């Protein structure tokens, strides 16, 4: 996946990566070097050799998704660059950001000519409006580098959740594909039987057409599932840094941890959920930066609503986990019962009963 033709890997700082990327594009355009695959976002010392080896192999494991998103997802890498660019252009604090807006406003004001002809007056009016807008943004801005960082961290966490959901959906669709294949096999067997019965005169032509339609429907369902699996796999691996036409191996899903479920408690977990919530963190930071009393009141209300929503979401998620756990236990019990019935039937058959 990320190995170059010499069998080595590279990780660079973001600033150096951009210099490298510029040289890389120029070299490729000139035809002087082959195209290489994506580099990791973090420098080599950010992880152990063992951790890098797991991320760089051609196997996607469920517990690697967070690391793969952080290192190789294009959106995350772009956000990291944008964050550093924001700090470079505007600074870290809200006051520094406001001052940059004021500087832009002053630049517009300085460009006004003050001439009295119609063209100059129109130009000066436009510059005045743009300068006033910059001045207003400086007065009202709630931004600082911390808010940008939290926003991008939130986006990264959401991408991890998307990757986890995609991997689960991939295996769900594989199971559905197996069921669709079994349905198609049964439909074909029924069609063959129907053809035999039609020849014997025990069914009508309409019955045969129905059997043929069942085969066609089963084939269509299977084709649709195969396309869904193909598209899902391509999008999934691109999300993690592979090309759409690569062929990484997708590892198995992790087993359910019953102890982890047993340790869940919405009441005691609420404080941690509030602490981890990015929307709440961002609004609290905006409140710290707010200067206008109306804005402060709006953010205070939003924060209170955030906390209520976090509690409701946590409780709902906990109930879904318990419901899924019950469904899993029922499915396991049913599978065990079917296995017992199969074993008993085999014993009876062996005994001639």
Locate each region found by the language model.
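Sec-dependent N-terminal signal peptides of Gram-positive bacterial secreted proteins and lipoproteins
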Residues: 2-4, 10-38
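Soluble, cytosolic/nucleoplasmic coiled-coil alpha-helices used as oligomeric scaffolds and tethers
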Residues: 82, 89, 96, 100-103, ...
